[in-house]
Each structure stands twice: as C-alpha cells, then as structure tokens.
Amino acid sequence: MEKNYYALAYYYFGPVSNPHEEIALHKQLFKTMDVSCRIYISEEGINGQFSGYQPDAERYMAWLKQRPDFASIKFKIHHIEENIFPRVTVKYRKELVALGCSVDTTKQGKHISPEEWHEKLQENRCLVLDVRNNYEWKIGHFENAVLPDIETFREFPDYADRLAKEHDPAKTPVMMYCTGGIRCELYSALLLEKGFKEVYQLDGGVIAYGLKMGTGKWRGKLFVFDDRMAMPIDEADPNVSPIARCSLCNTDSDTYYNCANTDCNNLFICCESCIATHKGCCSEECSQAPRIRAFSAERGNKPFRRKHLCPTIEQSCCLKEQENQPA
C-alpha cells in the first residue's frame, strides 16, 4: 500500500533571531522523520520546500508554527506519492533570494489574494509581469503575461531598469507573480524603488492561485525545483495541454529533462519519442559522448544526481581519470 505524502511550499520574510540554532533544531527533528527538503534560513527569514510522509509533514508544520519567529507562516500543500528531494538539506543562506543587490523590503507591493488576482486579470487594466526565469515560464504562464527573457534571479534588477524606460512608472499599474510568492517580496520592492506607483503581487504565488482558483487564467504547467520538474497547478485537472515544444522535433511537449551527458547536463524540453531515441540526451552529439549516465523510460524525467553517473564504480567512464589524479 502506497504511503500518502505532502509537498509543502512556504516562506517567511522577517527577522530571525538565531538562524543557526533554527537550522540545528530542524536537522535534529528530521532525524526521526520520513522527509526530504531544501530549506534555507538566515537573519532575514526562511525559504522552504519540503516533502514528507503525511503524519511527519503535519508534525513538522505544527512544530514550525510554534517557533516564535515562524508563527505566521502559511503552508501551501499538495498531495504526492513519494519524497521529491534527494536528501534533507537545511542550510544558512544570507540571501534567501539571490538578487545581487540590496532592496528595502519594508516597502513592498500590495499583496492580493488569488480571488482578487483573478478579478484583476479579467479587468485587463494592469501589466501582468512574470518574474520567473525564462525556462520556467516556457512551459506555463498566465494569459497575456509579459515574459522577461532572463535566466537567473540576478538579472531582474537590470530588467527592472528596462521596464521603467519602456513604460511610464507613474501611469503603469503592475501585477507580478512567481511560483510561491517569495521572489515578489523583493521584486515588488525593487519596482517601487524604480518609481512604479501601483504594484500588486499574487499572495502565495501561482501555487496558491491553483489551490484556490484551479486552472483559471493559467496556461500550461508550473515549473518546480524538485524531482517533479513540472506540475499542473490544479490537482483536480492533471491533463493539461502543453504550450511548449520538444527542442528536438518541435512537437507539443512540456516535459523537462537534464541531459544524460555528464559533461553537458543541459535542461531541455523533450517528447517521449526523442528522449528514447537520444538515450536521454539533448542532441545527437551528446548521445555519442563518452560519459553518458544510464537512462531508461522507467525513471521518467527525474533529474540526474551524482550517484547516477554509472550503475557501478567499476563501469565509470571517469574512473581512469580519477586514478590518474595526484593524491
């Protein structure tokens, strides 16, 4: 019988008195649980992505809300069948979102609920801004959204400068969204610094919108930073039509893989036929490379980890290189 698991997404922007103590307490708690996670904590808050066996997930949520610094945290919950991270990772990270510049987060955009967001989308009065990376919005986004061609979070400040030149900040209302809401905490503050007067941010991000409104005005799937890679935003509506195309044959597809060629590891969209033909690789050239990790349809599109280099160390194509390394 399969276990029931929860996927949790949550964050808190606010002072944390002793982040290193919180990290140690998290690690101690997780020793007795069937969980996996990627959690970052600093003096400015916490950014968490977590999966765990349902009773353990419920125990963790109750425990975290009892911690003085995190009592106001809101969890976004999805039902899953297994853990979706390779391990338990709880780390200190000075920047919860790697923006690359300082921003006054005491001045933020107006948080609006999924219901308010949906109404404003129907009004069609605001510039709807997707503040995620280009590989994220490629497989899913809101209707009529502006889609910045950026590859990392750190590129957004320069994009904000261009946006302020292309649109009159005093007269252009902006509605921004991201996956779970945390990036908008910084990006909305940045747009306000650039002179935009009317900035709204989707409270809880696309995840919260999907949980509350279903598919609504969303098209495609939501990119996520875990073993699922992508998910429909509405659990009740899993059969979502792809809006992207296979990078090899251009047929409709929304499945991401990372290239089986160890020396490439490129993130790319591919259909079932092409991924099988190219042995999990992003190109014919990569499929002929010397260091290819074992790919099979059964493993699906889960990201490769270091342990996937070869089935056994004796078969490792880089073993000879390792033996020649100086001690």
Curated annotation (Swiss-Prot):
Residues 122-218 form the Rhodanese domain. It catalyses: uridine(34) in tRNA + AH2 + O2 = 5-hydroxyuridine(34) in tRNA + A + H2O. Keywords: Oxidoreductase, tRNA processing. One of its GO terms (molecular function) is oxidoreductase activity, acting on paired donors, with incorporation or reduction of molecular oxygen. Belongs to the TrhO family. Catalyzes oxygen-dependent 5-hydroxyuridine (ho5U) modification at position 34 in tRNAs. This is tRNA uridine(34) hydroxylase. The gene is trhO.
